[in-house]
Amino acid sequence: MTPEAMAEAITRQMEQMLSTGTDEVVRLKKELEKSPQDAEVWFDLGLSLNQAGLQYEGLAVRLAEMRHEPENAEEGEETTIQVDVTPCLGFYKEALEAFDRVRELAPEYYGVECQRGLVYANLRDLPHAEECYLKALEEDEEDFTAAYYLSQVYRDMGKDDLAEKYQKLADDLNATNTDE
């Protein structure tokens, strides 16, 4: 396949994702029409929408890389690739709405805060991601995933002491879970 044909195929895939969503998102939305009070389906929809946002973002980066022509840069000049990820924001925002619905229907549903943190991290909203991971750890102080991703958020925020603290917690939790 030529680079032009590949770029065209990626563009079509991105357009389809924006118009209908992924097959899994479509399936889950149909399921919610039948069972709008099913917290598990809402949770799965949130997961699928977050994944669709990441998938779209990956396609956008790949397309931008294909269209990037570093040979046009001056020698020694750094070139950056501009990627418009604005369309995937809709997936992330809809994922947050789905997770909020889970909290309304089943406040005790395990993992919601951690998943909300992942979405906020994808949105690059680090303060909200931090808040979600801290809530997840309040709910379950042995939540390895929340501890690990909280360490990443703190690293991205430049809070190295906190990043190390939560990375150590994640490592300890991982070792404990591996031993069991």
Residue ranges of predicted features:
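Terminal, low-structured helical/coil segments at or just beyond the last alpha-helical repeat
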Residues: 1-5, 148-180
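N-terminal segments that cap or nucleate solenoid repeat domains
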Residues: 5-48
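Structural signature of tandem alpha-helical TPR/SEL1-like repeats
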Residues: 16-30, 53-73, 83-101, 122-135, ...
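Structural marker of alpha-solenoid helical repeat scaffolds
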Residues: 34, 105, 139, 172-173
